Amino acid sequence: MPIIHNIQYEHKFIIFPQDTNYMPPMVFGGKMLSEMDIAAAGCVRRACNDSPAKHAVTTRITDVEFHVGAEVGDLIIMTATISKLGVTSIEVTVKGIREHKDGKTEDICCGKLIFVTVKDPKNHRTENGKLIPIPHELIFGDN
């Protein structure tokens, strides 16, 4: 498989009290999954924008690991990178870093998200029941 040309998306957010559970006050895992999905979707959008495959939906989230928790006030930086490209699917690897209030950083999470490209995001199939092929030249260039 060819190397994918530096298609990345960075998503940053701060942990607020409503993002945490009550004991101890650490971020909900569901909040982290949601933010990972947002980062991955941004990466796919950047890769497929202005193409017939411009609509994509998340179909699977795999290999998720939470290494440490996050507290109120921490800055989380999610970096999404395209790791595999199929005919109608895109795999995105997301890695999260926690930046403490004192500026120190540590890995917080990672996972893979699979997207499929669709004609209409409200109806995940085309008229003949097939998904939209991804124009690889948009992602790999013309070389």
Tell where the protein language model's regions lie, with residue ranges.
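Hot-dog-fold acyl-thioester-processing enzymes
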Residues: 1-58, 116-143
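Preference for bulky hydrophobic residues occupying beta-strand positions
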Residues: 13, 59, 64, 94-96, ...
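HotDog/MaoC-like acyl-thioester-processing domains
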Residues: 71-72, 83-143
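Hydrophobic beta-strand-centered segment that forms part of the acyl-chain substrate-binding groove
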Residues: 40-79, 83-91, 104-111
